[in-house]
Amino acid sequence: MKKSKKKVIWFTGLSGSGKTTLANQLSIHLKKSKYTVNILDGDEVRAGLCSDLKFSDKDRKENIRRVAELASLLIKQSDYVIVATISPNNQLRSLAKKIIGNDFFKLVYLSTSLDSCQSRDPKGLYKKAFAGEIKNFTGLGATFESPTSFDLKIDTSEISIKQSIEKIISMLNIK
């Protein structure tokens, strides 16, 4: 096994920006290099660990707190933990970083435009939001605040998945 520099790679961006896709592809790449990896996908965490939470500001904060606490525990047993969650504002991302620790936390901002995310709509969520079936949907009814500080910025509408993974691997300074 290669020497690891344990990191939590925290993807933030709008729904449809490519967080889950990149998390899964990054995991495959890292596992091929014999690293241990865990993925925390926002949709999966919301369906299980955070199924009691709604989308109020208070519940969004608690959701991110729980995800960050879990990532903090998992990084003790893994080389990499990959988190794919919208985390819609700087306050929540700062909370996650504080819980996980500055030495472990790497923020990857997927800056893909709202128009691109809406045209992709892989889960049909924008369609539901426009139909009024989802209230306070981030990017439409609820605000997404672009990060003021990040380790890497990627627009997945401008570069390929492969190029995105290469940029992340370079940021992590691994092969």
Q: Model-found features: residue ranges?
A:
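ATP-dependent NMP and nucleoside kinases share a basic, alpha-helical "lid"
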Residues: 48, 54, 71-130, 136
